[in-house]
């Protein structure tokens, strides 16, 4: 395991988050380990909406000290877990209810 400090800033806003990253034998990057607080906040956001807009992804990343890519991948993985847990009950209608529509972006 490599341990370090991830200091990311935006304008005058800075957040500092401790992280753990494991590396595989061939030097490739392995799993990201999220803190309990990060996981809790991500789960709360997922409970509110299974799909997150780019703007919201940016906001979450800033507040948790993670990259937007990490947020995007966490949500992709969490949706797959949700799909497995709900089995055949997961229909396209249910997924479309959670996915933002164009009207959400246009403001109609």
Swiss-Prot record:
Location (main, coarse): nucleus
One Gene Ontology term of the biological-process aspect is: anterior/posterior pattern specification
PROSITE patterns membership: HOMEOBOX_1 (PS00027), HOMEOBOX_2 (PS50071)
Compartments, record wording: Nucleus
Q: Where are the transmembrane segments?
A: none
Q: List the disulfide bonds.
A: none
Q: Which residues bind DNA?
A: 27-86
GO molecular function: any one? RNA polymerase II cis-regulatory region sequence-specific DNA binding
Swiss-Prot/TrEMBL keywords: Developmental protein, DNA-binding, Homeobox, Nucleus
Q: Which GO terms describe its cellular component?
A: nucleus
Q: Which InterPro entries match?
A: Antp_homeobox, HD, HD_metazoa, Homeobox_CS, Homeodomain-like_sf, HTH_motif
Q: Which family does it belong to?
A: Belongs to the Antp homeobox family.
Q: What is this protein called?
A: Homeobox protein HB3
**Organism (species):** Tripneustes gratilla (Hawaian sea urchin)
């Amino acid at each position: 395991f490599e341990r370090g400090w991830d200091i990311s800033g935006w304008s005058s806003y800075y957040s500092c988050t401790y992280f753990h990253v494991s590396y595989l034998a061939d030097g490739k990057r392995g799993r990201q380990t999220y803190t309990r607080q990060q996981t809790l906040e991500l789960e709360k956001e997922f409970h509110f909406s299974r799909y997150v807009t780019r703007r919201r992804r940016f906001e979450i990343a800033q507040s948790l000290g993670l990259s937007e890519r990490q947020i995007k991948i966490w949500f992709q993985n969490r949706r797959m877990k949700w799909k497995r847990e709900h089995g055949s009950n997961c229909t396209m209608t249910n997924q479309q209810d959670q996915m933002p529509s164009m009207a959400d972006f246009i403001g109609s």
